């Protein structure tokens, strides 16, 4: 499958989707995107910048949600033109999808909306590549009918993204078998290494996270074999306005990615026995 001008798949090198969880300011987005572009260019890693203009599913109604559609799209367009990288953002049921699609290169559907049939079809019908996040409440096998809904629109540029599964209250676990199962959808599989370490609602009015396990799960996923890695990053995670506890520090992103690129090459060198 071709995505933003490059090929993706298990027979292709790993690609990266990364950026701050939410748009905090134009300068933060430009600075972060610039650093990520420099890192990925040195590693020969294809890169898509991501950030959200509206976080509609915050734990608390008083939490920062983002700058909104109009300002958010201006920021994403600035990143795209000034830094020279493709951009991704998520949309919601109330979002004017066509308007967003005029700016971004990839659309993303939130995990909580994965079972909303009309929403999935409406997003995919626009014709842009779509990253569909698997709900925390969904088995990997249940992504197959979701993809069938998506592709019924005629859009074949569909990614499926694993972001952990609910495990009791306020906790997520990552079953690495799901990455192999989700390949059966016929879509490139992306692993979200940062939301997978989230502790939903674990800090009362906001979610917690265990960012120390981001490299652990990222290495495991790459060793299993994935097409892409999704990772939210921030220059100052403790002061990030959304999902700081599970954001990976920008200053150590290069070190993490160096390891993952090397591991990806080894993993894909001889193919996958489970597919024989």
From Swiss-Prot:
What this protein catalyses is:
D-arabinose 5-phosphate + phosphoenolpyruvate + H2O = 3-deoxy-alpha-D-manno-2-octulosonate-8-phosphate + phosphate
Report which superkingdom the organism of origin falls in: Bacteria
GO CC, sorted alphabetically, is: cytoplasm
Q: Its annotated pathway?
A: Carbohydrate biosynthesis; 3-deoxy-D-manno-octulosonate biosynthesis; 3-deoxy-D-manno-octulosonate from D-ribulose 5-phosphate: step 2/3; Bacterial outer membrane biogenesis; lipopolysaccharide biosynthesis
Location in the cell reads:
Cytoplasm
Annotated EC = 2.5.1.55
SUPFAM superfamilies documented for this protein: Aldolase
Whether Protein transport counts among this entry's keywords is: no
Keyword terms: Cytoplasm, Lipopolysaccharide biosynthesis, Transferase
Q: Does the keyword Transferase apply?
A: yes
A Pfam family the protein falls into: DAHP_synth_1
Instruction: Give an example GO biological process.
Output: keto-3-deoxy-D-manno-octulosonic acid biosynthetic process
Quote one Gene Ontology molecular function term.
Answer: 3-deoxy-8-phosphooctulonate synthase activity
The entry assigns this protein to a family as follows:
Belongs to the KdsA family.
Identify this protein by name: 2-dehydro-3-deoxyphosphooctonate aldolase
List the source organism.
Answer: Xylella fastidiosa (strain Temecula1 / ATCC 700964)
